[in-house]
Amino acid sequence: MVSVKPLKFEDDELLLLDQRKLPGKEEYFTCKTYQDVHFAIKEMVCRGAPLIGAVGAYGVALACREFINESQEKFQQETKRAISELSSARPTAVNLFWALNKMNKLLGQVMEENTAPEDIYPIILNEAHKISDQELQRNYRIAEFGDQVISNGDKILTHCNTGALATTGYGTALGVIRQAHYNHKDIFVYVDETRPRLQGAKLTAWELKQEQLPFALIPDSSAAVLIKNGDIDVIFVGADRIASNGDTANKIGTFMLSILAKKYKVPFYVVAPVSTIDFQAKNGDDITIEERSSKEVTEIDGVRVAPTDIQVYNPAFDITPAENITGIITEKGIIGPNNREIMTIQE
């Protein structure tokens, strides 16, 4: 079974496997305050929608610990500010907002009961543990459903990193692939390098190598040739936010793959927990797309590879329209990418 631990909570500190340093170094980044958590999410020490949701929850717990000696009024003000700051770390992944809303609601309940700040911290910390543990259990259920659409001998294409590193320990799209491998299916995986941050090359390849699961790393630009030549049987991708009509925001390059999949009639599955669905978003137009630093495109590991004084467009995500998606694999089953089926699984 997978041994990757993307996060640990020990001695009132959150330890995050620093994904910026993989695959070269396996080091943990220590978060002692909610500000550390904000930095870790924003600067992609940790990444992946399900994981940053859990990490955000721990950020609220650390804020409660930080202000444990304040008056109830001051405690309430500071924790509210902390939640607001944490929510600004990254705008697209809805799991972060889902987790923060859950923590904020619980905080409001315990504050209404006039609970002392020193007694609130363990309650909030326990809730963060629950969110993290439940996320892992969701991954297992997702993997069981997803394995049903993988046949022995399948050649699979995946994009970005959707494994243990993107969740609290198993994976969404990569978790489905992992489950098929554990069930002794003869599969082969093609991994997009996923520019510009190379999550496929640095993270997914690292996870698959640890699992001894047969794979090949490919340039993003070669996916079309593989699909056209009939070398891909099914495509699995993750999601950062799914609108109520099935439109899906995911790592930049996903939309391009979905167009190819539709043209060449290759099944294209989005894999995500229900917490990734934004039931308030009518369609992809309601989803904010994060734009990141130009340095992610013009530099590789700090070395300039492009001319200076040029314009750069670097969206972190794109929107795949529902009509390009075969199905959405969740912990509640495989559903169609449409409003009717999506609304039936609303929590």
From Swiss-Prot:
Entries under NCBIfam families matching the protein: eIF-2B_rel, PRK05720.1, salvage_mtnA
Keywords: Amino-acid biosynthesis, Isomerase, Methionine biosynthesis
Catalytic activity: 5-(methylsulfanyl)-alpha-D-ribose 1-phosphate = 5-(methylsulfanyl)-D-ribulose 1-phosphate
BP-aspect Gene Ontology terms: L-methionine salvage from methylthioadenosine
Entry function: Catalyzes the interconversion of methylthioribose-1-phosphate (MTR-1-P) into methylthioribulose-1-phosphate (MTRu-1-P).
Recorded metabolic or biological pathway in which this protein acts: Amino-acid biosynthesis; L-methionine biosynthesis via salvage pathway; L-methionine from S-methyl-5-thio-alpha-D-ribose 1-phosphate: step 1/6
Family affiliation: Belongs to the eIF-2B alpha/beta/delta subunits family. MtnA subfamily.
EC number of the protein: 5.3.1.23
Gene source species: Natranaerobius thermophilus (strain ATCC BAA-1301 / DSM 18059 / JW/NM-WN-LF)
Protein's UniProt name: Methylthioribose-1-phosphate isomerase
Site (Transition state stabilizer): residue numbering on this chain: 160
Gene that encodes it: mtnA
Any Pfam family the entry gives: IF-2B
Record: residues binding substrate: 47-49, 90, 199, 250-251
Active site annotation, chain numbering: 240
Top-rank EC class of the record's enzyme: isomerase
A GO MF label: S-methyl-5-thioribose-1-phosphate isomerase activity
